[in-house]
Amino acid sequence: MLTMIFACDMNNAIGKNGDLPWRQSTDLQHFKQITLGGTIVMGRKTWESLPGKLPDREHLVMTRSNRDDVETITYEGVLELSKKREIFIIGGGEIYNLFLPHTEKIHRTIIHCKVEDADTFAPEINLEIFKVSDSNVVKKSARDEYED
């Protein structure tokens, strides 16, 4: 099964200048809870934006070049693997759009803000295809870093 997980702002933005436009503790805890022990798939840019491997998760990166620092996988490889177990698609924008037609579940957190000059966006979700089973809108707390 393919499952997407992402946080977006009120305008569907997920990135700015190659990084998340916020540090939102509630969403990071939610992401960890859902993906811990699982397999996460991401594009090269998302991989390079991480501080390193996230603990207790298998990391697979889609890229056109060989890498020594992480295991890589093809589009077809992701689809084949998703027949055997749940795969979490964690970004970025191109990867979300690529796998949206094959996605069975989406975990979306809406960050209560509007990011100026965002350059990466989550895919538009057709609510005739996807049923919302859980929806989170999180507001800024004292531990969070972003403009609201």
Question: Residue ranges of each PLM-predicted region?
Answer:
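Enzymes that bind and transform nitrogen-containing heteroaromatic metabolites
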Residues: 1-148
